[in-house]
């Protein structure tokens, strides 16, 4: 199975399955002499890990990361950084009923058809549990971006189902508030509505989709490589690679369909840009404005409501998903999306420094 690596100069490779012994990753390209320890990585993992609130899966994992290599006397050496997280709360017996059945809406069918074998326990490699290592790698990228370039990468949940967060102006977002509630939401009124909606869904045994926004501030001009390695193209690739993501928007995204050129173009004055409809990227290259990306995540198919499907023999069957699952996967996706944006930005920054300055 290929496709486990992202990046060119800053490269991240992950491995492991949902119910395997452990998850791990190799991070190549981290510049030397960056002060780094598990304490720099753990906070983002704690934001993503399961079992932290009543709104997410009850599976409880400590998600304690261990650095295996690439750090000496508290600083990166420039060699590959190896990290691992051990799994501890697997209940593989919950998945015995779907060993020979395909859960509708999941990767069960496609993995079986492609490889002729699949790890049915919790989805195996296709499980969002794999993203823990992306978050670990992303924490390193975020630290380097922050300390060496002053770049901040942060995200918030902007919609669950029909409940939308009030429009946010970047400079007015209260990031402490975002990180103080289980929904990563800057709008207190929306938090209450999110709570009601998730409680209702849990009673019904159903799930719901979500939308979240990621913002990178203080990104310099010049990141991105025409024509196939455009910064927005690489961001879209990275964000689409997150489990359950079905759509990515940069800047105004699909709203540009209804805009006119006189409205959409980001006009400039000697003092700078007057708007940011493009989301901080022009011609595939960063413009110096905040980079804004929005992603849409589908409702998880792991629900207790019976669904029609087939088994390995192609026979019609009914599937009821057991186990422990998130009623809305978008809630824990905020730190994952931040990580993917940070990984792409650091990769492009290193490429920019190698080529241009």
Swiss-Prot record:
Segments of this protein annotated with the region Disordered: 38-60
GO biological process: amino acid biosynthetic process; aromatic amino acid family biosynthetic process; chorismate biosynthetic process
GO CC aspect terms: cytosol
Chain sites annotated for binding NADP(+): 48, 54
GO molecular function, one term: chorismate synthase activity
Flavoprotein as UniProt keyword: yes
E.C. no: 4.2.3.5
Family the UniProt entry places it in: Belongs to the chorismate synthase family.
Enzyme class at the top of the EC tree: lyase
Pathway: Metabolic intermediate biosynthesis; chorismate biosynthesis; chorismate from D-erythrose 4-phosphate and phosphoenolpyruvate: step 7/7
UniProtKB keywords: Amino-acid biosynthesis, Aromatic amino acid biosynthesis, FAD, Flavoprotein, FMN, Lyase, NADP
Gene name as annotated: aroC
Organism placement in taxonomy: Bacteria, Pseudomonadati, Pseudomonadota, Gammaproteobacteria, Pasteurellales
Subunit and partners: Homotetramer.
Protein name: Chorismate synthase
């Amino acid at each position: 199975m290929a496709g486990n690596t992202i990046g060119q100069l800053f490269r991240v490779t992950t491995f492991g399955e949902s119910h395997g012994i452990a998850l791990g990753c190799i991070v190549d390209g981290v510049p030397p002499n960056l002060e780094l320890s598990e304490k720099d990585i753990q906070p983002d993992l704690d934001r993503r890990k399961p079992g932290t609130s009543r709104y997410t899966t009850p599976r409880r994992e400590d998600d304690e990361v261990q650095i295996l290599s690439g750090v000496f006397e508290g600083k990166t050496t420039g060699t590959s950084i190896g990290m691992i997280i051990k799994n501890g709360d697997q209940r593989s017996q919950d998945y015995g009923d779907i060993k020979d059945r395909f859960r509708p809406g999941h990767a069960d069918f496609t993995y079986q058809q492609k490889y002729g074998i699949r790890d049915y326990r919790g989805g195996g490699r296709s499980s969002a549990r794999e993203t823990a290592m992306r978050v670990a790698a992303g924490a390193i990228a975020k630290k380097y971006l922050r300390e060496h370039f002053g770049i901040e990468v942060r995200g918030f949940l902007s919609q669950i189902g029909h409940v939308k967060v009030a429009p946010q102006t970047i400079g007015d977002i209260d990031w402490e508030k975002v990180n103080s509630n289980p929904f990563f939401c800057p709008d207190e009124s929306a938090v209450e509505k999110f709570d009601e909606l998730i409680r209702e869904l849990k009673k019904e045994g159903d799930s719901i989709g979500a939308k979240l926004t990621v913002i990178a501030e203080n990104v310099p001009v010049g990141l991105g490589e025409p024509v196939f390695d455009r910064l927005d193209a690489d961001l879209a690739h990275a964000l689409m690679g997150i489990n359950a993501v079905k759509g990515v928007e940069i800047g105004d995204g699909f709203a540009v369909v209804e805009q006119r050129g006189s409205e959409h173009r980001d006009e400039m004055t000697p003092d700078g840009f007057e708007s940011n409809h493009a989301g901080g990227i022009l011609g595939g290259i960063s413009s110096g404005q905040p980079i804004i990306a929005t992603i849409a995540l589908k409702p998880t198919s792991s629900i207790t409501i019976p669904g029609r499907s087939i088994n390995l023999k192609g026979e019609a069957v009914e599937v009821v998903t057991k186990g422990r699952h998130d009623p809305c996967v978008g809630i824990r996706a905020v730190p994952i999306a931040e990580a993917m944006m940070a990984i792409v930005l650091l990769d492009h920054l290193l490429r920019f420094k190698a080529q241009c300055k």
